[in-house]
Amino acid sequence: MRFEFTEEDRAFREEARRWLLANVPSARAPMGGPAARAFALDWVRKRHAAGWSGISWPAAYGGLGLSYERQIIWHEESVAAGAPSPLDPTFVCFNHAGPTLIACGSEAQKSFHLPKILAGEALWCQGFSEPDSGSDLASLRTSGRVEGDHLVVNGQKIWTTHADIADYQELLIRTDPGSQRHKGLSWVICDMKLPGITVRPIENMAGVTHFAQVFYDDVRIPLSNVVGALHDGWNVAMTTLGFERATAATALQVELSARIEALSAMARMRSDAVDGGLLHRIAVARAEAAALRALTYKTLFKEPATPFDGSIVRLFFAELAQRIYRIAMDLLGPQNAEASPDNEWIPAYLEAFSETIAGGTAEIQRNIIGERILGLPRGGGR
Ligand SMILES: Cc1cc2nc3c(=O)[nH]c(=O)nc-3n(C[C@H](O)[C@H](O)[C@H](O)COP(=O)(O)OP(=O)(O)OC[C@H]3O[C@@H](n4cnc5c(N)ncnc54)[C@H](O)[C@@H]3O)c2cc1C
């Protein structure tokens, strides 16, 4: 595969760079809650007003309808200009809810929701995991009973990132009573303001409250909110996870590459205090970041693609992120880390522990790679 940018792509890059450098917010993004929502949506609105929202989304729903190469250019220039991290509260909207609606939604669902996302009028969260159903998602029990033209939802989700500030949720529930495993599930658009929904935020070890438990008590959701066919939610969910693990990595790996460059610069400034072992780790991580970039682009443009390809990218990204933030801690030293509580490396280091859990744990990604991509036998007598 050859991946090259055209003359037109380069002109687009120049234009994007000029706009970003003049418009990227100078304030740091708040970590969670309503302030994080307001900050993230303001940034989307600013992009939307200037015609930069939804680079590769279909023009029919308010996007620019440009190639995915242009989307990549946008991510690269955003990171270079110091734009807010793509892992902000709009991450689900832009990286998997919107793309899932584009791939599987009805005309009515697309026309209503996609322009709202692009205009910064709505935030989404993802309600897949349950207290006893994380890695084994197919065992989920939150139910949706069909009653006339509504589903009546009862149960509980957990680890729902930004549930406290989201307007809509990708909700995966069991709609066929008595069904087992992957069968009988539905992927439903849930309005987070509906009566019967209770959100209880959970604080993580970085001291940030950005995920939550969500309880559903006779929540009535119109059947027209089912995405794809009723009881066929597993296929839609696999589409969502495919986006979460592959295309979503585009923006994140660009950001990670910028982090390792910043670390290299920091090491150059402290050259007298940095030993050869640390320099070696930085050099290896820099090479791995370049390899991750090549791997991400290869996966994005692979044909035919499968929903499992993203697991390789997701796993490599997650473990590399942890290595890079560990290097940052070793380079800074404990005294510098403690002395500067607003230092952005410390929260990033703490948050990176979750990279090998969120979106499917490292063990689950390895299982998928082994079983679905390499065709190895299923292990452990499952
Ligand atoms: C920061 C963060 C944000 C998240 N945001 C969301 C969100 O917005 N929406 C959402 O729905 N979920 C979210 N999650 C939840 C995430 O998807 C789950 O935590 C993840 O899928 C693991 O599930 P679990 O926590 O139930 O762990 P478990 O499934 O109980 O796993 C426990 C351990 O057992 C291992 N294990 C389990 N099964 C196997 C197996 N078959 N083979 C080998 N090892 C196995 C796991 O790898 C893990 O180490 C988030 C998680 C994190 C950390």
Placement of each model-derived feature along the sequence:
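Glycine-rich phosphate/cofactor-binding loops in nucleotide/flavin-utilizing enzymes
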Residues: 2, 69, 73-77, 96, ...
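C-terminal helix-coil-helix/basic helical segment that borders enzyme active sites and/or dimer interfaces
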Residues: 28-34, 268-279, 289-343
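A short, Trp-centered hydrophobic/proline-enriched beta-strand micro-motif
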Residues: 120-128, 172
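Glycine-rich beta->alpha junctions and the first turn(s) of the following alpha-helix
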Residues: 3-5, 197-291, 355
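Internal helix-loop-helix
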Residues: 48-111, 115-120, 162-168, 289, ...
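Glycine-rich phosphate/pyrophosphate-binding beta-alpha loops
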Residues: 94, 134, 158-163, 205-206, ...
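A structural signal for short hydrophobic beta-strand segments in well-ordered beta-sheet cores
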Residues: 142-145
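A short core secondary-structure module
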Residues: 149-150, 154-200
